[in-house]
Design a protein with these regions (language model features):
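Conserved amphipathic alpha-helical "coupling/scaffold" segments
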Residues: 1-160, 202, 238
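Conserved NTPase motor "head" modules and their coupling/switch loops across ABC/AAA+ ATPases, GTPases
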Residues: 198-244
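Generic alpha-helical segment signature
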Residues: 56, 174-177, 199
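An accessory alpha-helical subdomain
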Residues: 188-191
Length: 244
């Protein structure tokens, strides 16, 4: 993607992220995302405007779409997944004998690290199934940006061990053995960590589009202003959202 060069004075003049008199700034309008990572992505969209005409139109189309789905997981679940994936304790390849040898110890003694691993693995499995369903059920008339995201989900799931996880946990509620949890944990936090980050980015994209759509409806903003390829244009009736 290509971006417009924007200096600090322009940000200040437009009151993008702060104002001299502690008045409302533009980002505050769009900061009510459902997730922390969604909020960071929204800030990125606002701070780094695109110069890529095709990508601008894709974003416009996605924000304007009235059929944007609910987020597939709630904020607490997504925060826990992020915490789990960033957790660096006890990352090791699974071994049947080691998994079996620690079963009794894990039953008798509470282990906070084991709790993070077990819940993290189960939430990631839930995430994979939710994304698989979303990608399969996406409407044919969905915006191009959503279609590209669904295609990325399908490519990642079908082209890696994550697809095998989906097949092996098709019931989702099936009880996982200690060895299976250890095996998936190494896969999620090591082997396929970057793939999972890419999958999570789809949810944050949905969050940003849903938030921008909601604000546009509430404030009667135009979601799809006309975009032209040249500098030969004029605009009338445009004001800063906080100009009274």
């Amino acid at each position: 993607m290509t971006y417009l060069d924007t200096d600090k004075q322009t940000y200040a003049d437009l009151s993008i992220t702060e104002t001299a008199n502690n008045e409302q700034f533009l980002f505050s309008l769009f900061s009510r995302t459902e997730t922390k990572e969604g909020k960071s992505l929204m800030m990125n969209w606002i701070m780094y405007p695109l110069s890529d005409l095709d990508m601008i139109r894709k974003r416009q189309e996605a924000v304007a779409w009235d059929a944007l789905p609910e987020l597939l997981l709630n904020e607490e679940e997504l925060d826990f997944i992020e915490y789990y994936l960033a957790y660096r304790d006890q990352i090791r390849e699974a071994h049947v004998l080691l998994s079996c040898a620690t079963v009794i110890d894990r039953l008798l003694r509470y282990d906070s690290t084991r709790y993070v691993i077990c819940r993290g693995v189960k939430l990631v499995i839930h995430l994979l199934h939710c994304l698989e369903r979303w990608a399969k059920e996406l409407d044919e008339d969905a915006p191009q940006l959503m279609k590209e995201s669904a295609r990325m989900v399908n490519d990642i799931l079908s082209g890696s061990e994550l697809g095998e996880v989906l097949e092996q946990t098709s019931g989702e509620e099936r009880r996982l053995s200690n060895y299976t949890i250890d095996k998936y944990d190494y896969l999620f936090r090591c082997t396929r960590l970057l793939s999972l980050k890419e999958l999570l980015s789809v949810l944050y994209l949905l969050d940003v589009c849903r938030t921008a759509h909601r604000v546009a409806k509430e404030k009667n903003f135009c979601c799809t202003p006309k975009v032209v390829e040249t500098m030969d244009f004029s605009v009338e009736g445009v004001v800063h959202p906080f100009v009274k």
